[in-house]
Amino acid sequence: MSDYKSTLNLPETEFPMRGNLANREPVMLKSWAEDDLYQQIRDSRIGRKPFILHDGPPYANGSIHIGHSVNKILKDIIVKSKTMSGFDAPYIPGWDCHGLPIELKVEQKVGKPGHKVTAAEFRVKCREYAAKQVDGQRDDFMRLGVFGDWHNPYLTMDYSTEANIVRSLSKVIDSGHLHKGVKPVHWCTECGSALAEAEVEYEDKKSPAIDVAFAAADKVTLLAKFGVEECSGSVSMVIWTTTPWTLPANRALSVAGDIEYALVEFVKGDKTSSVILAETLVESCMERYGVDSHNVLGKTSGQSLELLRFNHPFYDFDVPVILGEHVTVDSGTGVVHTAPGHGQDDFVVGQKYGLEVANPVGDNGVYKSDTEIFAGQHVFKANDNVVALLEEKGALIKLENILHSYPHCWRHKTPIIFRATPQWFISMEQKGLRKQALNEIEQTQWIPDWGQSRIEKMVENRPDWCISRQRTWGVPIALFVHRETEELHPDSSSLMERVANKIEQEGIQAWWDLDAAELLGEEADQYRKVTDTLDVWYDSGSSFSSVVASRPEFQGHDIDLYLEGSDQHRGWFMSSLMISTAMNGKAPYKQVLTHGFTVDGNGRKMSKSVGNVIAPQTVTNKLGADILRLWVAATDYSGEMTVSDEILKRSADAYRRIRNTARFLLANINGFNPETDLVAVEEMVALDRWAVRRAAALQEELLEAYEQYNFHVVTQKLMQFCSVELGSFYLDIIKDRQYTAKGDSHARRSCQSALYLISEAMVRWIAPILSFTADEVWQLLPGQRDKYVFTQEWFQGLKSVTLESDLSDDFWSELLTVRGEVNKVIEQARREKQVGGSLEAEITLYADDALSTALATLGDELRFVLLTSKTQILDLSAAPADAIETELSSLKLGLKKAETEKCERCWHHREDVGQVATHPTLCTRCVTNIEGDGEVRQFA
C-alpha cells in the first residue's frame, strides 16, 4: 500500500474557518424569527424560578448609537446566562414615547399645536412619529442578536400603559406625597416648560459677575451693630451675582448667622465708601475692587444683622437681611442676593421669612408687562441693561465677565433659568419620602458598589420633584381642582380610575375630549381640569407598575435587576425609586447595575462634530454583531468603555481564536456518535481526563463570573483556555493520536469523547456572548439534541474525576511549563535550520530527581506530549557544558536532529520504520493502527 492518507483520521467539518458574520448572521436571524425562538425559550422555562430584568426604555427618537448597543447587549448576556442557569428570564423591551424631543420633530413637519393643526391632530402625529422610530430601533436591536418579545414590547404610549401611569399617580396621591405649589423650577424658555433635573446639562457659559451695593435704610442702627458711631459716606451691604437679570426679583439679603461680618471703609480715587462683607473675604474683595486703601471699622455676627433693612439698588423699596444656611464664604462677599422666585435655596429661606415669591419673567423668558423698567426685555439681553442701570445709580462696585458652569437645556443646548411657576410636586418631606428612599437604597445591591453613595448623595440633596409639564404630547395629570380654592376634588381617586378606564380604551386624548360634567355632574362648574402633562421621567419611572404589573410574565414577581448607563442614577433609577417608594414603600429593584459611557480611543466622548462616532450598524455590517458583542463582554463596563476601529480589530482577532478552537473541536469529532462511542471519563486516557477535569473547573469559574455579571472575566478565562490550555497544549498534543490512531480505538475515542464533552460545554459558555457563533456550532454537534442551544442549561456532563493512578493537576501544569521550554529550544533550532520541525528533533531532558521521577511516569508517551520523535531523561548533574538553560532551575535541555527513518504516515523518526515488510515505509505503531487492534495509550 503506497497511499496511507486514506488511513488517517483527518479533521473534517462544515464549520468554515472564516466567520463571514456580516452575511451569515442575517440568515440566522431569519431562522430564529421563523421558528419563534424567543417563545421556544419561554416555553422551555415554564414553572422555573423567575429572574426579571426590567428594561429601561430608550427614547423613541433617532437611530441607536453605540451606547444603546452596549446597554442592550449587556442585558441580553444576562438574560441568556440566567436562562442557561435554569431561570425563567423573560425580556420585555420598552420605549419611552412621550415628551419634548418628539414634539419638536413633529413641530418641524406640521407646526406648533393650535396653529396649523389642533392639539388632538398634533398628538396623532406624535404617536405616528414615535411608532416609526420604534420600528427602526427595534430592527437595529434585533440585528445585535438580542432576544426578547420584540413584537409585543411595552411603549409608554400604549393605551394600557398610559392608563396605568394615571393609576400610579393616583396611588402616589393617596399616599399623601403630591402637593401643588409656586416654586422655582428649571425652566427652558425655548421649550416653554419646566425641566426635570435629568433634563439639565451643565456647560460653560460666559456671564457678567457683579458686586452690587445695597444702601442701609437706617445707617445709625446699622453702625451701632458694629460698635461704630460714624463713618464716611453711605453704608452698604454688598452682594455678588452672575445673574444680574434676577435683581428685579430681589426680596432679601441672606447672611450666615455664625459668620463674622466686617464694616470696611475703603478709599478708591477721590471717593470713600463703607461696605459690609464677610470678614474672611475682606482682603480678596478689596483686591478685586482695586481700592487704594481700606480699614476695618468694626465686626459683628451675621445673627446680629437679622431683619435690618437695605434699599433695593434701583426700585423704591427696601429688603430685609435674613439668615440662610446656604450662605458660604467660599467666594463672593458672604452676602447672598435672594430672589425667592429664581432659586431653590432662595425660595426655601424666603418661605421661612414669608417673603414674596416675585416672578416678573414670562414663559418665554421675557419680563412681563408690569415689570418696572425692564418690561418686554428678554432676561439674558437685559443683563447689560441691569448693569448699566446699577452703574447709573452708583450701586455697581465691580463688573467682570467670567466663564462658569451653568445649567443648559439638554435638548436645545441653551441656558435655562430658575423661574417660580405653579407646578405639581412629589414632596420629599411631607410624608417622609426622602428618609424612606434612603433606607431602600441601603436594601438594594449596587453594582459597582460606588453607585450606592452616588445616588444617596443625590437623594439627600434633591428638591421636591416637579412632575408637571406644560406640553401637548404627554400623559395628563388627570385631576380636577376647585376653581376658587385650588383644592383637589375629594373623590380624586375614583375619578382618576374612571379617567384611566377611558384612556385604556381611547388613549390620552380621552382626557382632553372629556366633558367634566360626564364625571362630575352638577359639580362640573365648580372644578376645572388640570391641563398639565406628566414629566416623561414619571412615565418611565412608573413602568415597574404600569408595565410589569400588566404583563403575565411578571405577575407576582419582584423585579430583580435594573441595568442602565451611569447617568441614570439621577434619571431612571431615581424616578423609579421615588415612585415605587411613594406607592409601595419599597424600591422597585433588588439590584442596580450601571455601565460607563463609550468613548473613543483617545478617551473622548463620541460626537458627530468631532467625527469620532462608531455606529453599531456600521460594525455589524462590516464585522458582524458577534464582534461587537465580544467587545462589550470583554470590556470592564464599570468605567468608561473605550472603542475604536483598532480595538474592534483586536476583538475580531480574539474572536478568530475562539472560532478556530471551535472549528478544531468540530472537525475532530466528525463521525463521532455520543450514543455509541462515548468513553466514560473514568476510562479515558489520563490527558483526556485532565482536559475534562480542567474544563469542569473552568465551568465553575465561568458560571461564577456570569453570576456576578463579570463578563470581562468570562472572556479572559475563555481566551486563556482556548489559547493556552487547549490551543498550545492539549489540542496540539492530541493531534497525533487523533489523526493516526485506529479510527474506533479506545485511544482515539477517549480523545474524541473529551473533545465532545468540551464542545458541549463550550458552546453553552459562549452562547450568551457569541450567540450567532454558538448557534452555528450547535447545529454541527453530533448526537440528538434540541434545535437551539438557547433552550439548554449549562452542560452537566463535565465530570471532575481523578483516579488514584492519575498524575496530579500540579504535574500537568508543570508539564505544560516543561513543554513550553522544549518548544522554545525547538523553535530556535528551526530558525537556525538544525531541524525542519519538532518531529525531526530528539530531545534530552536533564532534570533533577523530582522532575525526572514525574516525567519518567509517562514512559515512551512523553514524546507525544513534547511532539518529538524521541525523548530521554537524564540526571541534571549529567548535563554537558553546552546544555541549554531553561527558565526552570530543575531542567536543562539537549537537542539533536534525528538520524532514524521518517515514517511516511505519522512523520515520526523511528528506528522501527520498515520492520514490517508489507509496509516498508511505516513504523510498527502505524502498522498496528492500520491492521491491528490499534495502539494503547495510558497517559497521552
Swiss-Prot record:
A motif ('KMSKS' region) lies at residues 605-609. It is an enzyme of class 6 (ligase). Its cofactor is Zn(2+). Zn(2+) binds at residues 903, 906, 923, 926. Binds 1 zinc ion per subunit. Keywords: Aminoacyl-tRNA synthetase, ATP-binding, Cytoplasm, Ligase, Metal-binding, Nucleotide-binding, Protein biosynthesis, Zinc. One of its GO terms (biological process) is isoleucyl-tRNA aminoacylation. Pfam families: Anticodon_1, tRNA-synt_1, zf-FPG_IleRS. GO terms for cellular component: cytosol. ATP binds at residue 608. It is found in: Cytoplasm. L-isoleucyl-5'-AMP binds at residue 564. It comes from the Bacteria. GO terms for molecular function: aminoacyl-tRNA deacylase activity; ATP binding; isoleucine-tRNA ligase activity; tRNA binding; zinc ion binding. InterPro entries: aa-tRNA-synth_I_CS, aa-tRNA-synth_Ia, Anticodon_Ile_BEm, Ile-tRNA-ligase, Ile-tRNA-ligase_type1, Ile-tRNA_ligase, M/V/L/I-tRNA-synth_anticd-bd, Rossmann-like_a/b/a_fold. Its EC number is 6.1.1.5. It catalyses: tRNA(Ile) + L-isoleucine + ATP = L-isoleucyl-tRNA(Ile) + AMP + diphosphate. Monomer. IleRS has two distinct active sites: one for aminoacylation and one for editing. The misactivated valine is translocated from the active site to the editing site, which sterically excludes the correctly activated isoleucine. The single editing site contains two valyl binding pockets, one specific for each substrate (Val-AMP or Val-tRNA(Ile)). HAMAP family: Ile_tRNA_synth_type1. Catalyzes the attachment of isoleucine to tRNA(Ile). As IleRS can inadvertently accommodate and process structurally similar amino acids such as valine, to avoid such errors it has two additional distinct tRNA(Ile)-dependent editing activities. One activity is designated as 'pretransfer' editing and involves the hydrolysis of activated Val-AMP. The other activity is designated 'posttransfer' editing and involves deacylation of mischarged Val-tRNA(Ile). Belongs to the class-I aminoacyl-tRNA synthetase family. IleS type 1 subfamily. This is Isoleucine--tRNA ligase.
